[in-house]
Structure formats: structure tokens, C-alpha cells
Curated annotation (Swiss-Prot):
Protein name: Glycine cleavage system H protein 1
Positions carrying N6-lipoyllysine: 60
Any single Gene Ontology cellular-component annotation: cytosol
Cofactor: (R)-lipoate
Pfam family, one: GCV_H
Family assignment from sequence similarity: Belongs to the GcvH family.
UniProt entry tagged with the keyword Electron transport: no
rRNA-binding listed as a keyword: no
Residues annotated as domain Lipoyl-binding: 20-101
Organism whose genome encodes this protein: Pseudomonas putida (strain ATCC 47054 / DSM 6125 / CFBP 8728 / NCIMB 11950 / KT2440)
Any one of the GO BP annotations: glycine decarboxylation via glycine cleavage system
Alphabetical UniProt keywords: Lipoyl
Record note on quaternary structure: The glycine cleavage system is composed of four proteins: P, T, L and H.
Amino acid sequence: MSELRFTEDHEWLRVEADGSVTVGITAYAQNALGDVVFVQLPELQQYEKGNEASTVESVKAASGVYMPLTGEVVEVNGQLEDSPELVNEDPMGEGWFFRFIPADAEAVTALLDQDAYDRLLKANDDA
């Protein structure tokens, strides 16, 4: 399943072939932040759903990146340490933040699909 899933916090998730889940922030989120100047990546450890795993700082603000599901972070995108601008340049690709192994692999499917996320964005724009 390589279909993207999303959170209401504007994070995207992609299940990889090995069962790990890659996490990043959406184009909407990086646009709202503006130019990203620093990314604090998570430690390789277990995090509970909703806990702050990472921080992204921009010229406008600092924002937390929250663990979308309970699981163990197994890899971080070290490129972001030297090139945080990748979050702006390619938020859904090279600008990914971390990969984790979810405690419940099926829980990913309960997150927003593309249509549901698009409705969320429309509701935000209408508000």
C-alpha cells in the first residue's frame, strides 16, 4: 500500500514495502510555515500517538510534528540537518522527516485518505 494518508495536523504518511511508515508535512503545512530554516529530528525510540516527535522552525514560526500513531522511529532524514529547505522544495518527497514501525499496522488505514484531506483543506479555506 503506497497510498498516502493524512492527519488533521497536515502530516502525510506513506506505508513502505517493508511495513515502515514514512512521515512528512504536507505542501499546505510547509506553505503556511514559510521558509524552513531548521528541523529537529526525533530520536530513534518509541513514541506514543500525539507526542511531539520533531520540530520544524521557519522564518515565521516553530511548529511540532506529532507522532500520528504509536510506534518506534527507526530512521530519520539526515539530509534535513544540513538542508532544511528540502521541506519547502519537496515536502512530499525528499523533505520527509522520519520513518517508524507502527504498533498497529492497520491503524494507518483509519487516517484521512486524499479525498478526506482535500475536504479538510476546503473547510479550512472556507473558515
